């Protein structure tokens, strides 16, 4: 079935990609899950735990545990909302922003090196990105309609 092969093709590149990215993250003393949340905060700050768990499709306790580690490492700050004391806004600290920039550059170099070894055109990459974004939206919608 083509749809099964389609999904399996994305699953099969995930682990090898992580293996290539891990040394970059280890060099900066950050785990992949922490990196994904740090990157999410950088792109959407100020943001909240609930927004992160929704965008990343992870459980709130998992996100909370990861956020705790990022706070302890002085990579993010937490500020109470003025309107709703239960709501807390998350932003990068200067140290967190610096780490984000450095890791982004290293990861981009890795990604560019991998793409350079293929014959993938810019148009093919853009089409794949569009399709993956479409699927991501549907999957998020499906997982939040429980």
UniProtKB/Swiss-Prot annotation:
Residues 1-137 form the HTH marR-type domain. GO terms for molecular function: DNA binding; DNA-binding transcription factor activity. The keyword Acetylation does not apply. This is Uncharacterized HTH-type transcriptional regulator SAS2155. Gene3D superfamilies: Winged helix-like DNA-binding domain superfamily/Winged helix DNA-binding domain (1.10.10.10). GO terms for biological process: response to stress. Keywords: DNA-binding, Transcription, Transcription regulation. It comes from Staphylococcus aureus (strain MSSA476). PROSITE patterns: HTH_MARR_1, HTH_MARR_2. InterPro entries: HTH_MarR-typ (IPR000835), MarR/SlyA-like (IPR039422), Tscrpt_reg_MarR-type_CS (IPR023187), WH-like_DNA-bd_sf (IPR036388), WH_DNA-bd_sf (IPR036390). The lineage of its organism: Bacteria, Bacillati, Bacillota, Bacilli, Bacillales. The keyword Metal-binding does not apply.
């Amino acid at each position: 079935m083509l749809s099964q092969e389609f999904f399996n093709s994305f699953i099969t590149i995930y682990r090898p990609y992580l293996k290539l990215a891990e040394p970059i993250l280890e060099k900066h003393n950050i785990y992949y899950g922490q990196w994904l949340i740090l990157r999410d905060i950088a792109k959407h700050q100020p943001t909240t735990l609930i927004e992160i768990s929704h965008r990343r499709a992870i459980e709130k306790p998992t996100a909370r545990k990861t956020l705790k580690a990022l706070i302890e490492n002085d990579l993010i700050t937490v500020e109470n909302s003025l309107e709703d004391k239960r709501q807390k806004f998350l932003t990068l600290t200067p140290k967190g922003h610096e780490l984000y920039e450095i890791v982004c550059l290293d990861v981009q170099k890795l990604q560019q090196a991998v793409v350079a070894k293929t014959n993938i055109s810019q148009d093919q990459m853009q089409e794949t990105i569009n399709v993956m974004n479409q699927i991501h939206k549907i999957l998020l919608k499906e997982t939040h309609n429980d």
